[in-house]
Amino acid sequence: MPVSKHMVVYPYFILLLILIAAAILRVVGIDFGLPMAYHNDEPVLVLACQQFFSGDFNPHNFLYPSLLMYFMHAVQRIYFVLAGGPVDLTMLYLLSRLTVAAFGIGCVIFVFLLGKKLAGSTAGLAAALLLSLSPLHVIHSHYATTDVPLSFFVLWSIYQALNLEERGRWCDYILTGLAAGLTVSIKIPGAAVFVPILIAHLIRIQRLEKMNLLRQCQEYYRRWPARSVLFLLPTFTATAAYLFFKHFAWFADRLLRRIPVDLWQTYHDEIVSHLAAAAGKYALLFGGGLLLIVFIWPIWRVRLGRLFTLFAAAVVAFFASTPYAIIDFKQFAHDFLFQMVVSQTTWSGTFADKAPALVTNFGYLLGDFGPVFLFFVVLAAARAIIQKDVPLFLFFSFGLFYYFYLGTWKLMFDRYMVPLLPILAVLAAIGFVWAAVELASFLCAKWRIPRWCTYGILTLLLFMPPAVGMGKEAVDFDRYLLKKNTRTLAFEWATANLPRQAKILREQYAPEIEIDGFDVINVNFMFNDSVDADYVYKNKIDYLIVTDKLWSRPMQEDGVVQPRSAYQRIVDYADLLWSIAPTPANPGPEIHIYRIRYPDPK
């Protein structure tokens, strides 16, 4: 049957409409809160971009790698060159958010391409529509943070891995390595993309060499039994890793002399306790990984040069886009350790009332996609395994590994699930399309019901209701951003009523009145027992600003979950001066402003 021009153009016209809807959902309200940053991770990136205008391109902060900062700065440079005028912090925030929104729209495009590659244009369009409406994806596309850009680079890496599995050219290995390296340079957990990449490499070799993977490996070791001694390596590695992390306190002092990072001293107990508790996990990770490498070594050694080239390209891409990880290694090591080790202990009280990470994270995904679409996700994954659909299995292998890896974390922010949303969108679309085709074929053969009738009914009954629900949640969030937040109202009151010469202490969710010239101490999550009357008297604090976003969270000290008693003691040394609670018209946190009550001099 000849393909008409209209049949080729039609899907791209629908995609254009979806992209317009995705852009509207991600741009409406994007200037919320400015000149304040309502998301506490935004200043990490935006203030680094501001510093770049001075000519110093060292971010001096490696809580995240640097690639996204440089992307944002490039956009900001272009804008200020064209628009002229001084560098304005408010505009830096807005441009940074727009950069992330653009990555969010790019994710929708990649989802269409991947869906089309795996199951045709209909699945690609359905996947693009689902991701464009995803509430969690829409929410985090408004923030100048790393999660949505990470999703974009994850999709690019998976797309390249599929090309590697399909064609296996040298350029495919190089491009895949570059994509993976840049993914890690957005956010370290992006290293999970190496799972589908390695699977793609193994499948490619097995197909080209016409190998039976299991039989080839068995034959390799049966022919030369002495090679079986290699299996002692994983056992030794797992044992050594377990003993090292379990007794890390013994190594800590020696490591401190070798790697003089002050974090070892400041958070010595937290690091030791975390690594000791995770000794079994690390032993399983190192031992299991090496066992897999040893067992399938007969496959690894084929075309090993191409695999090394891929990893070399990844390393070059990472350090080219995060160059100060080498130049300023001490700061990089400090922040990397803090992000991957210390933050897993000091913030764990925040999630003390949550279920384990695997359950909590599943709840985030269920709340975003709903049970119907998650059913189609499971259907597509099961079908891929049963029918040995290699490309589709390769595609969702990232999602499986990433989900279970983050299931070992104590931090359970919903934003950590953002890279899984495109994976779920594609799987849900493929599962729905497959179910619709199979059911339509059955009904057409048995009762001669027209296929278009079955497609229409299934779309109206099973696809549209949950999709409309997702879209409504996304629109509700945009409407939320358009309302005047309690932080903005508190900012306006404080800047109009507090003395300019006053010294103010605020916790991290309180309005950022320092941008209006006030002398402010920001104590972030450390607003715990260290903040008391002696602390405020010693630092000559005049006013205190706190919110229920932090005082309502428990904290964890020495493994014991307890309320933040520092907030309960505020009334012992301060008087409530002003407060505001959220309303439907003015959402946001409850905010209290206190005046410090100094004792009468004797």
Predicted segments with their positions:
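Transmembrane-helix signature of polytopic, membrane-embedded enzymes
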Residues: 12, 18, 84-87, 106, ...
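Aromatic/acidic, Gly/Pro-rich catalytic loop(s) in extracytoplasmic/lumenal soluble domains
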Residues: 531-534, 538-602
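Transmembrane-lumen/periplasm boundary regions of multi-pass, lipid-linked membrane glycan transferases
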Residues: 25, 45, 64, 70-71, ...
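Membrane-interface transmembrane helices that cradle and orient dolichyl/undecaprenyl
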Residues: 3-7, 116-118, 122, 157-173, ...
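Transmembrane-helix motifs of polytopic, lipid-linked glycan transferases
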Residues: 20-23, 90, 94, 98-118, ...
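Hydrophobic/aromatic-rich transmembrane helices and adjacent perimembrane loops
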Residues: 140-141, 147-150, 183-188, 192-195, ...
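Specific aromatic-rich, kink-prone transmembrane helix
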Residues: 110-113, 149-166, 172-180, 197, ...
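Transmembrane alpha-helical segments
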Residues: 431, 456-484, 506, 512-513, ...
